[in-house]
Amino acid sequence: MVRSMDSFFHRRSSASARESDLAAVRAKADLGDADAQFGLGLRYGNAVGDALDFVQAAWWYRKAADQDYPLAQYNLGVMFARGQGVPQDSAVSAGWIRKAAEGGDAGGQHDLGVLCHRASVDPLQAGNVESRIEAYKWFHLAAAQGYRGSAAAWERLTITMTRIEIAEGNRRAAAFVAREPAHLRIS
């Protein structure tokens, strides 16, 4: 499910107030404000009826994602996985999910854990142990943020791992540092 920031758009009673808010957000987005770009992605991707526009949502998410905005990267990855507003592409989806995970997004970390776990149980994939350790790390990080289902997935995964693999997964999780989003970096 595409996630959102609860209070990004405040509901107002009049349509003119909403249009005014939209114009202000669009002006900021056009100037490169990643928060506003993400907000427009949310607006178009979660709208009802004729206002729903996955192509516009993906376009605005991409603008914010290119500025290392983890939630936009995650939502764009989900859109590529589903083929919403963009061609369905599992490899591109996984790339955006990885960027979101590396940026500290718990949803991205959980979903990357799922992708790594799937690779670890695929008998045709080389590097099953490496994928299992990576899945462990990502589930661990998502669980530490309280992301739904991650703690259970992390615990289930440990049943299939050796002590050495678990120790390595813990070492990697402890060493993880989320990259700072580009739009927040001081140049």
Give the positions of each predicted feature.
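Short helix-capping/linker turns of helical repeat alpha-solenoids
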Residues: 30-33, 46-48, 53, 66-70, ...
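TPR/TPR-like alpha-solenoid repeats
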Residues: 43, 64, 79, 100, ...
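N-terminal segments that cap or nucleate solenoid repeat domains
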Residues: 2-44
